[in-house]
Amino acid sequence: TQDTKFFNYAIEFPNDKLFEIFSNFCKKNNMVMPISFFEKKENNFYNSLVVINADGELSELYRKSHIPEGPGYNEKFYFKPGDTGFKVFKTKFGNLGCGICWDQWFPECARSMTLSGADILLYPTAIGSEPQDPLLDSKDHWQNVMKGHAAANQIPVIASNRIGTEKEGSVSVTFYGSSFIANHLGNIEIEMDKKDEGFVSKNFNFSEITKYRQSWGNFRDRRPDLYKKICDF
């Protein structure tokens, strides 16, 4: 839906109370947490993300690069395309590459973050049913795309997707959850169901994964001189 009332939910970074709450939480629990939020920057609005390190420090922002538009997903009405470029955040536990939702459908995003030194990729997500086609269930397609990123880049991928139903007027979207963690071979290690809130975890040895990636040589054998054509289409 498109309604100007929702612009009132946007917050400013880093002055909102939200960041103080999660900063204290991360510091207390010795954990790293990416937080996505609706950002207001002067008269511009973004779908943004900040990573809070285990000491409570806030990273610089990432602003969602790819803004979709479709029935039930009217994001171009609310969000300006991001101006930060793809980001890799150095944390206590490793280098975290973060995209937001629709970013996950673009292999350029995953490859750029991996080349920039990411140890693991994370995509906070809100994807579900398609109002224009009630019979379409894109859950497997959605997972397959990110499993492909994991396998092609030899890097673990985490996708955190919401649950529940949102309805505005005659348009309804039911989000299908199914958050998952895939390993560097593209295999799903653990997955949530479609309806329940919760969390799952998996340990990775980033040093061993880096050695595995190097042993394959597909980053060594890249030909960036041949890829410039992509930017011309």
Identify what each model region corresponds to:
Residues 28-29, 116, 153:
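Helix C-cap/helix->beta junction micro-motif
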Residues 36, 123-124, 160:
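Generic beta-sheet signal
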Residues 11-13, 20, 24, 40-148, ...:
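Active-site catalytic loop in hydrolytic enzyme cores
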Residues 1, 50, 61-68, 180, ...:
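Short beta->alpha transition motifs characteristic of CBS
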Residues 1-15:
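A charged helix-plus-loop insertion that forms the helical arch/lid used to bind
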Residues 152, 160-233:
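C-terminal beta-strand edge segments of enzyme domains
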Residues 141-148, 152-156, 162-163:
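Catalytic phosphate-donor-binding core of small-molecule kinases
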Residues 32, 120, 156:
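Short, Asp-centered acidic motifs that coordinate Mg2+ and/or phosphate
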